[in-house]
């Protein structure tokens, strides 16, 4: 398999774009390879500029629930473009998509659209602070909530600590109001509330996707809800990644825990840049122009993105059973790969939620970021590069989640399992 054209394109891009990419994970640094430059996507497949074709388990990092170039979404976008790209004024499509999402989430009575998941989370936290008149936020080590300054915080030793910036360019003053807790450890959250009497909100990925796939325990989420209620803090579920993938009705429908605010992204835009945050009407009433908490965006709710999102979410609501079908395929995939790994003496931990899947080369189950960090990154990098050569495109980082789309068939799943067995055999014979 030749990737000469990708090598050339990457070299050129590095002279023009920092690191050659517009989002760091795309650089393949975690797996030690060269990023593939993509020419097109169709259904379950990506084709690179060298003509190599891959079954795509990344799906643009989650948005493409129906695969590449879904006919109904593509048609909706083309029709919308005919009427204009952006107006900077309200359109009916915004209300239509809002009503659709509200009908699918019990916790959402009103919703505001933005252009990215980062914006959604940033705005949700500002809203929580404005609603509670408190400043501090609690987040969890290993949970990613976008790249806004207050959320780029390193972990401490595992106990809850006041945060320090994890990126140059983020002043310590910006993160001093961010407290860190350990995922799936309620005692660490209690310590945060003990350390601060000014907590506005606790933000969590109920199904974490950026330390690999690590779902929160239901009992942990229940206790988190109780802690927030007891301390007058809001509970935010960041479902930018898991929203509409783990369940049609959100993580609240499978955990039994209802958040105060939900953030959404990825699938809600059908492949176009859309984010959103929603809550009960009482909380959303604090948002401008109805209330004093300011939030705005030139391209928020733009008609093309709304058309794509409306087509995607309408199709999902009309075919809600597909989540269980995709979960069956995701489960078959990781169980098949786990069995193949076991045959060659390789330990693999697996999990799925809806159309999301994850695996770790680890002896023990993964419950938090520290567990994830104990996984074999070198083995993952080798597995990734060899699976690429077999024609299967997995996320280029151990700490990312995989995705199944409706375009990926049972036959493709079986082919992937067979390829993984071949790769594991090669790895153990190295």
Swiss-Prot record:
CDD domains: OAT_like. Keywords: Cytoplasm, Isomerase, Porphyrin biosynthesis, Pyridoxal phosphate. It catalyses: (S)-4-amino-5-oxopentanoate = 5-aminolevulinate. Belongs to the class-III pyridoxal-phosphate-dependent aminotransferase family. HemL subfamily. HAMAP family: HemL_aminotrans_3. Homodimer. It is found in: Cytoplasm. The modification N6-(pyridoxal phosphate)lysine is found at residue 266. This is Glutamate-1-semialdehyde 2,1-aminomutase. Its EC number is 5.4.3.8. The keyword Transferase does not apply. GO terms for molecular function: glutamate-1-semialdehyde 2,1-aminomutase activity; pyridoxal phosphate binding; transaminase activity. The keyword Cytoplasm applies. InterPro entries: 4pyrrol_synth_GluAld_NH2Trfase (IPR004639), Aminotrans_3 (IPR005814), Aminotrans_3_PPA_site (IPR049704), PyrdxlP-dep_Trfase (IPR015424), PyrdxlP-dep_Trfase_major (IPR015421), PyrdxlP-dep_Trfase_small (IPR015422). It is an enzyme of class 5 (isomerase). Pathway: Porphyrin-containing compound metabolism; protoporphyrin-IX biosynthesis; 5-aminolevulinate from L-glutamyl-tRNA(Glu): step 2/2. Signal peptide: none annotated. Its cofactor is pyridoxal 5'-phosphate. GO terms for cellular component: cytoplasm. One of its GO terms (biological process) is protoporphyrinogen IX biosynthetic process. Gene3D superfamilies: Aspartate Aminotransferase, domain 1 (3.90.1150.10), Type I PLP-dependent aspartate aminotransferase-like (Major domain) (3.40.640.10). It comes from the Bacteria. PANTHER family: GLUTAMATE-1-SEMIALDEHYDE 2,1-AMINOMUTASE (PTHR43713), GLUTAMATE-1-SEMIALDEHYDE 2,1-AMINOMUTASE 1, CHLOROPLASTIC-RELATED (PTHR43713:SF3).
